[in-house]
Amino acid sequence: MKKTTLISIAVIALMSVTSCCNASPENEAPQVKNVIYLIGDGMGFGAVTSLLLSEDNVTGFEQAPVIGLSETCSADNYVTDSAAGGTALATGTRTNNGFVGADPEGKQLTSILRKAQDKGMKTAIVVNTTLTEATPAAFYAGVTSRKMTYDIAKQFTESGVDLAIGGGFNHFYNRPDSLDLTATLIEKG
């Protein structure tokens, strides 16, 4: 009896594996053309629950084809700040609180934005805060303190981002080091 049961399980398992591997062109997922990565900075389960409970209709949030949630702790603290959280979202790497786009040793990490650029894709950063804020900066900069906003702005000018919409003009113009990064950006088009 045991031998028959084991053979039956093996046959079912083999059929399951081969049916999953029997992909044909019409069953393949379509090629992804564009990716829009929306981040609700600081938007935890409480905020999402409030949204869902406050609306009588189905929200756009609920209609999204893919939704991901992230629960993290930073490399040096149980509670993650937006610099370490943004870095984890941008690079997949845990880092120290306050670090932006850099690992715990201070080495700049490669973000998903840079990987998209390496594949020849156009990239953009659109924020309702400053472009040098920790979360968006984690996609193009690498610094050991989120307060290094002037350095972050300089790294933005070298980032190759095709479109940027956000605040923080004072980090690019009329700076303590007298650099006019707006002129640099205009030169680059």
PLM region descriptions:
Residues V17-S19:
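C-terminal motif of bacterial Sec signal peptides marking the signal peptidase cleavage site
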